[in-house]
Amino acid sequence: MMDSLPDAIVNYILSYNNNARDVAVCNCVSKRWKDSMPYIRSLYFPRSSFDNHTGQEHPDNIVWKMISSIVQLEELVVYTPFSGAGLALWLSHAGSSLRHLELRMDNLVENQTCIEGPLKLDCINAAKNLESLKLWGVLMTHPPRWDAFQKLWNLEIVGARMEDPALSAALRACPNLTNLLLLGCEGVISVSIDLPHLQQCKLDFYGLGNCSLSLTSPKIEILEVQGCSWIRVCESNCLKNLSIANNAGNHLIEVSDPDHSSLF
């Protein structure tokens, strides 16, 4: 059936194939299918992608070969382990076209970043046109070397060890966020969020529950906070849903907009 279709239609159909294993199989089916692979727009590497890998070639290089064969990759999701050097190489090719990037960083061990070359967080700076960035298992004790991601509207970080200056620097590099999600983050003591376009914000800080939060986002509609003892929300006429939780049992909330004081 596929063999009877015009090349343009075959390319279009196969461009929606995103699982790395399926892409590799397609390369072996026929030359025609292999020639369609450069038109793939999304590539996904599951956690188990290289569990049974016995070859001499490093998984980073295998990923690189697949990425470098694609003309304009828009989405890259990598759950399999990788190095900072590998990520830097991938993004040197695909960074300008990427719109969505999701990475399982696995760099919560502090000495790991000292031995593997480029810091993974710093490498992300090459993907300047990102619209969505999702990170898992992040060590952010130093400010990432990021320029501004002007097109980034969604930032999600799950499972992280952070320090206040590093988090503040990361948020400053994402001035146009509309959605911010920080879940399972340790080490944060005081955070100030000043994002004029932010509409949804979900924060979950691990620790003693004594973190302080100052939020200046006039368009905020949904705010969910866990682990803060002091919260200040500057004027907002858009707040619709609010959820505050603190296992320590103590929290103080200040809202500068008297119209929403009844929420508390």
Regions found by a protein language model. Give the residues of each.
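Leucine-rich repeat
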Residues: 2-197, 204
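Detector for repetitive beta-architecture
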Residues: 132, 154, 190, 197-200, ...
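Short, low-complexity, polar/charged sequence segments that are solvent-exposed and flexible
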Residues: 152-155, 174-176, 199-202, 221-223, ...
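Acidic, glycine-rich loop-and-beta core segments that form the ion-binding/anion-interacting portion
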Residues: 208-264
